Design a protein with these regions (language model features):
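Flexible "arm" and connector segments at domain edges
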Residues: 1-67, 71-106
């Protein structure tokens, strides 16, 4: 793992250590909902919704910001809730293989 990524994860762990688990969980839900709103706005833009009062650049900047917030909160959630890294990686691997097999069959 890249040392910069490890440092970011360690900072996220330190931040999480100073929060109650309920706060971390609630903030993750909040950040996920903000990302969902940003993705919906992108979809509306892609389908030429004339009621949008923003441009493509603004939408993508918002998506980057919300993705960053979600990733930070996921790191804190993993740490605070003692999610096993190995179990998580195993589950990710299984899902990727299953998704890959699905598209390979087409």
């Amino acid at each position: 793992m890249n040392s910069e990524i490890i440092n970011v994860y360690n900072v996220c762990k330190h931040i999480a250590d100073n929060k109650h688990s309920t706060e971390v969980n609630d903030l993750l839900v909040e950040e996920l909902s903000e990302l969902i709103k940003a993705v919906i706005k992108l979809e509306r833009y892609n389908f030429c919704d004339n009621t949008l009062r923003c441009n493509y650049h603004d939408i993508y900047n918002n998506i980057y910001e919300e993705l960053a917030d979600v990733i930070i909160m996921i790191c804190q959630f993993i740490h605070k809730n003692k999610i096993s890294h190995q179990n998580l990686l195993d589950e990710i691997s299984k899902k990727i293989i299953r998704y890959y097999e699905t598209i390979s069959d087409k």
